[in-house]
Amino acid sequence: MVLSAADKNNVKGIFTKIAGHAEEYGAETLERMFTTYPPTKTYFPHFDLSHGSAQIKGHGKKVVAALIEAANHIDDIAGTLSKLSDLHAHKLRVDPVNFKLLGQCFLVVVAIHHPAALTPEVHASLDKFLCAVGTVLTAKYR
């Protein structure tokens, strides 16, 4: 999915609001995903999956930090996330559908915290961006 100049501006704009909340939004995203899609928990058997756990906060922060990094390098998402793509495809072997589920949960978290900023246009741009990230993360599965 190609991101237009307007999409890129919308994504960068919403991520300025997200940047200071990586741990909080990341943890909320993971908790929402684990609750809504319980099979996603199978990749985290060693984690304390209870609300507010340090492991959920820590991993959530990593997830959102990677999204922030991708937004900061929006013209080279593939290069920016290349190592993560390798990790998820070859070592962790995460089912590719989980990236879409994570993206949906992240959109909900952004909507909860920034309802006025998540206009229909920004929502569409952020969705396209998250799809692009998912495509990059699953590219090495082939």
Curated annotation (Swiss-Prot):
Keyword set, alphabetical order: Heme, Iron, Metal-binding, Oxygen transport, Transport
Annotated ranges, domain Globin: 2-142
One GO cellular component, as annotated: hemoglobin complex
PROSITE patterns: GLOBIN
Binding site for O2: 59
Signal peptide start and end residues: none
Gene3D superfamilies assigned: Globins (1.10.490.10)
Residues binding heme b, per UniProt: 88
Tissue specificity remark: Red blood cells.
GO terms assigned for molecular function: heme binding; iron ion binding; oxygen binding; oxygen carrier activity
Gene Ontology biological process terms from the UniProt entry: cellular oxidant detoxification; hydrogen peroxide catabolic process
Any further remark recorded for this protein: This alpha chain is from the adult major tetrameric component, which has been called hemoglobin A or AII.
Complex and partners: Heterotetramer of two alpha chains and two beta chains.
Its biological purpose: Involved in oxygen transport from the lung to the various peripheral tissues.
Family: Belongs to the globin family.
Protein name as annotated: Hemoglobin subunit alpha-A
Organism: Gallus gallus (Chicken)
